[in-house]
């Protein structure tokens, strides 16, 4: 290990620079072209600019560092240089606007599968999708997805799937250590970021276009199997709703059964797991 590597400044050419060759060897349509930069404000913003200037379906923007990366509801995405995967994929799907919100779950499945592969078969059940856009390992966030889109008439002109995966980091700020993790911290067996990237792109290529055309039906069983909130006591962070997660419907809505047996379909917002004591009381 070089002095630079010891300080987290991994050589770009030795790691992510292999990604185009791996993507090409797998014959993937997504990830080509792959635009790689050391630092950018936001890969989603880069992808939007590319979309407006005619970049093709599958074009992907990847950065070692983001200065203005964000998640849902404008949250800042913290990512030390060289530790993680930060990328955005341009998807020209031509689907109705109603098909866009569930795509964050489809992207979540692709990320989940790639993370589970990197951790090894023994950890497959530990990696789950948390509605609407997170991937967790043993209850801690390892990845997040931000899906954005633009309309052209009644159709979606393009979708941007922005993805951040904590891969190599072995330490986290104190305020995050209880709620976040990385593939490395969970004992990952394959820490090659280029391989993880290609695995995610392969999953997106397999599922996203079909989901945009036909809905969640083809992935619903897998989504149900890896649903982080199923059977768990949950509460909304921005409304009085509290109850038990009881699945995700074919429209991508979270189903929550309240104490009186009513099932509420949640289309937007954020839910968190309730503490065990609170769940027993409520």
Describe the residue ranges of each PLM region.
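N-terminal lobe of the biotin/lipoate ligase/transferase fold
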Residues: 1-120, 276-282
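Long, positively charged amphipathic alpha-helical accessory segments at protein N-termini or as interdomain linkers
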Residues: 2-12, 97-126, 137-282
């Amino acid at each position: 290990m070089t002095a630079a590597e010891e300080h987290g400044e991994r050589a770009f050419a030795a790691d992510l620079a292999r990604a185009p060759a791996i993507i090409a060897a797998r014959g993937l349509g997504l990830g080509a072209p792959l635009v790689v930069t050391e630092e950018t404000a936001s890969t989603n913003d880069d992808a939007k600019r590319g979309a407006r200037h005619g970049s093709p379906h599958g074009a992907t923007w990847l950065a070692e560092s983001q200065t203005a990366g964000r998640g849902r509801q404008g949250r800042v995405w913290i990512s030390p240089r060289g530790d993680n995967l930060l990328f955005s994929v341009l998807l020209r799907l031509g689907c109705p606007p109603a098909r866009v919100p569930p795509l964050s779950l489809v992207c979540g499945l692709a990320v989940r599968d790639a993370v589970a592969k990197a951790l090894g078969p023994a950890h497959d059940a530990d990696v789950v999708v948390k509605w609407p856009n997170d991937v967790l390992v043993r209850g801690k966030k390892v990845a997040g997805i931000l899906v954005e889109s633009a309309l052209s008439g009644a159709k979606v002109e393009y979708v941007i799937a922005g993805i951040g995966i904590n891969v190599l980091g072995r330490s986290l700020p104190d305020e995050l250590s209880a709620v976040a993790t990385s593939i490395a911290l969970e004992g990952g067996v394959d820490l090659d970021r280029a391989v993880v990237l290609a695995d995610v792109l392969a999953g997106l290529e397999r599922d996203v276009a079909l989901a945009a055309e036909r809905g969640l039906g083809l992935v619903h069983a897998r989504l149900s199997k890896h649903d982080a909130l199923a059977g768990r006591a949950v509460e909304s962070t921005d409304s009085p709703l509290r109850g038990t997660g009881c699945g995700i419907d074919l429209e991508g809505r979270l189903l929550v059964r309240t104490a009186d047996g009513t099932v509420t379909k949640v289309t937007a917002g954020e839910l968190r797991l309730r503490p065990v004591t609170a769940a027993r009381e409520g």
